[in-house]
Amino acid sequence: MASINLIKSLKLYKEKIWSFDFSQGILATGSTDRKIKLVSVKYDDFTLIDVLDETAHKKAIRSVAWRPHTSLLAAGSFDSTVSIWAKEESADRTFEMDLLAIIEGHENEVKGVAWSNDGYYLATCSRDKSVWIWETDESGEEYECISVLQEHSQDVKHVIWHPSEALLASSSYDDTVRIWKDYDDDWECVAVLNGHEGTVWSSDFDKTEGVFRLCSGSDDSTVRVWKYMGDDEDDQQEWVCEAILPDVHKRQVYNVAWGFNGLIASVGADGVLAVYEEVDGEWKVFAKRALCHGVYEINVVKWLELNGKTILATGGDDGIVNFWSLEKAA
């Protein structure tokens, strides 16, 4: 089994870290204290470079997401709004971001934000049981709601887009994952993934080109892998649970991340960071580490590319971001 080794620990907040996202060497983080902090992650340098205006939101920052291949950032808040931030061009080359727009529409806390792979759709989800899809242009200044999806029966915790297709997954307190697709400018639920016995906190798509698989993490302490069977009938897709990953977690699984390296990472309330590998069609534990944030719960995990290596980042209730390397056993 491989080992998980701490590279760097950054104390960013006094309160819990809910979310972060990585793009172009910058890690954006969101916390209960309403602040969005940006960290430069390059070589052996992990430096706080900006703190965005906390007056933009009245409550916690629950989710952050970079627009693909740009310096545009979306942040969803418990105050029911979404803020859009853009990098300011400065003569002294300092990294600063300005508030570009505030998006309103949800009736309750915004739990998740996610950009489509082309950057022209922004999905948001909320405690109001709905998923909204917003359309924007290249500037990212104006947003039009083109669809409100209301088929979940409970709080929607998370949204994620397929890495290459206009396919959206939403995870909910109603114990399901729903798959959404655009048919003739009308977004429809094309599949309901049933199997978890508790809240589904997050999901993530396989990054392999041309592959349609999804992993999900739940209150029932399991991580599941789902596969699209390629059969559409009456605008419906068949997805099946392909695997339940090895039993590592003893409490809720809050976040899962499927890396470009094919590995799946999961974190949760038990403070364990687990990494899984698929070998000849069977999923095995590749590495695991307990107490990654001491006694605190872990809310988010991401794969990052650093110096040509793939590393992991985790964020917890302790307000700390930890960076980890994976080392295979000799």
Swiss-Prot record:
Protein name as it appears in the record: Cytosolic iron-sulfur protein assembly protein 1
More about this protein: Present with 5640 molecules/cell in log phase SD medium.
Function: Essential component of the cytosolic iron-sulfur (Fe/S) protein assembly machinery. Required for the maturation of extramitochondrial Fe/S proteins.
Organism listed in the record: Saccharomyces cerevisiae (strain ATCC 204508 / S288c) (Baker's yeast)
Keywords for this protein: Cytoplasm, Nucleus, Repeat, WD repeat
Keyword Nucleus: yes
Family: Belongs to the WD repeat CIA1 family.
Protein location: Cytoplasm; Nucleus
HAMAP family, per the entry: ciao1
One GO cellular component, as annotated: cytosolic [4Fe-4S] assembly targeting complex
WD repeats: 12-53, 56-95, 105-144, 151-190, 195-236, 248-286, 292-330
A Pfam entry, by short name: WD40
GO-annotated biological processes: iron-sulfur cluster assembly; tRNA wobble uridine modification
Source taxon at top rank: Eukaryota
